[in-house]
């Protein structure tokens, strides 16, 4: 029994391990991977490995895994990656898993600076990536520092601005909050819709030379072949759509492209190594097939996948609406509960206020009663004193009468009697004056007693009003309410140095509609506004001395009003012959 081969396949978010037989083909391994992760849009993807010479290579599906130039290691390492890119992610990507894999791969390309991304776009994309991971921003769930372990923006962008890590996180948190209500899957798609407008998105670059020996870049992507000057990967100079190409072939390092326009000469360039020409041919065949397929009616399989995706999306929207409804209901109940608690606290405060007022009124009443009793005691004492003085006056009158009678009856010493009489007369006058004063005091005390009695009656009436007022209402009781791209090469022999592929363009509709496209920022006012705001914010912290060569090129393109699609229209102008002549002259 042959010993199985241990294989480790790393996707963008998982590691898968398999044991395969020595006769297992690339397709069998590939099918096992896509089945495991539930992927049906298999035509975009491939298995990549580093060959014995250290070059990244795509696993051939029609050959045995063990017969290819994989390193003899245990386990054998593969990466599951997107090999071909869609023209428009929002129109072509069907499954959520497909969107997620593209999102993670493109994000990694931007963060590692393999795909140039300007600063303001990098921050906006970072906020969408945060939304895709964390969902809606919440002050309770997302405390300060919740982004501290996240890779958010390219290191190049951070180095170019005088902002701390915390300041970058604060900016992204603000934009994260702006995306409230957006589903995680939708955030990934919004990320890709913006990222696909970046100049280097989805392009495979290869070093080539024209017949003059000029060093150039060949860019192979979903739309065709583009030629770049050696010092500028952002701005293609010449473009050939796939619909203009009928045959691609190479012999050793010489690569020949035959246009559909038979009046045009062959498009010839040279690659430094044979294996590069093989990769170019494979990518050309795969991209051309997908380009043609997109311009034909969908197959039954794709129609079924789209119908299923629509149904799943509709179901998710319903679930989202139900969750939102339930969330709003819970929030309403919480608000109602908080309102009742506030009302209860207000009632308790009012009751305490009533109690304090009642106690104060009772104390005032008690004080007034005490004061009234004191006044009554003083009035009684004054009354008794007045009565005593009256008795003394009466006794004095009687004594006077007695003396007068004695004076009449007895004849004694006239002077002595007169002196006694004068003495008693003076005493009577004094007593009379004292009696009048006491009577006046009695009247005053009686007046004050009446006032106290009136205050007492008034206080009793106020207390009675407080005690008989209806109590505040009690707080209410709370009731908690597939198919693969045909990209393998038909070889004449194992050591053959020449390969050729015919590219058919029959039966396609609107073969160059991509030239009518505009960027997401141009058609989406919200994205346009966000990018403008971010650009203004970051310009104040930018260190102009740290601008890279790509920054300078990008800014110059912006200044001249160019973007990815305007450039595409420009580089395809003229007939095929004119553009080939232009390439030869570079």
Curated annotation (Swiss-Prot):
It is found in: Apical cell membrane; Cell projection; Cell projection, Microvillus membrane; Cell projection, Ruffle membrane. The modification N6-acetyllysine is found at residue 60. The keyword Phosphoprotein applies. GO terms for molecular function: actin filament binding; cell adhesion molecule binding. Keywords: Acetylation, Cell membrane, Cell projection, Cell shape, Coiled coil, Cytoplasm, Cytoskeleton, Membrane, Phosphoprotein, S-nitrosylation. It comes from the Eukaryota. InterPro entries: Band_41_domain (IPR019749), ERM (IPR011174), ERM_C_dom (IPR011259), ERM_FERM_C (IPR041789), ERM_helical (IPR046810), Ez/rad/moesin-like (IPR000798), FERM/acyl-CoA-bd_prot_sf (IPR014352), FERM_2 (IPR035963). Phosphorylated by tyrosine-protein kinases. Phosphorylation by ROCK2 suppresses the head-to-tail association of the N-terminal and C-terminal halves resulting in an opened conformation which is capable of actin and membrane-binding. S-nitrosylation is induced by interferon-gamma and oxidatively-modified low-densitity lipoprotein (LDL(ox)) possibly implicating the iNOS-S100A8/9 transnitrosylase complex. The modification Phosphothreonine is found at residue 567. Residues 2-295 form the FERM domain. Residues 302-462 form a coiled coil. The keyword Cytoplasm applies. It is a peripheral membrane protein. Residues 308-340 have a biased composition (Basic and acidic residues). Residues 305-340 are annotated as: Disordered. The modification Phosphoserine is found at residues 366, 535. The modification Phosphotyrosine is found at residues 146, 354, 478. GO terms for biological process: actin filament bundle assembly; regulation of cell shape. One of its GO terms (cellular component) is cell cortex. A head-to-tail association, of the N-terminal and C-terminal halves results in a closed conformation (inactive form) which is incapable of actin or membrane-binding. A motif ([IL]-x-C-x-x-[DE] motif) lies at residues 115-120. Residues 244-586 are annotated as: Interaction with SCYL3. Interacts with PALS1. Found in a complex with EZR, PODXL and NHERF2. Interacts with MCC, PLEKHG6, PODXL, SCYL3/PACE1, NHERF1, NHERF2 and TMEM8B. Interacts (when phosphorylated) with FES/FPS. Interacts with dimeric S100P, the interaction may be activating through unmasking of F-actin binding sites. Identified in complexes that contain VIM, EZR, AHNAK, BFSP1, BFSP2, ANK2, PLEC, PRX and spectrin. Detected in a complex composed of at least EZR, AHNAK, PPL and PRX. Interacts with PDPN (via cytoplasmic domain); activates RHOA and promotes epithelial-mesenchymal transition. Has three main structural domains: an N-terminal FERM domain, a central alpha-helical domain and a C-terminal actin-binding domain. Probably involved in connections of major cytoskeletal structures to the plasma membrane. In epithelial cells, required for the formation of microvilli and membrane ruffles on the apical pole. Along with PLEKHG6, required for normal macropinocytosis. This is Ezrin. It comes from Oryctolagus cuniculus.
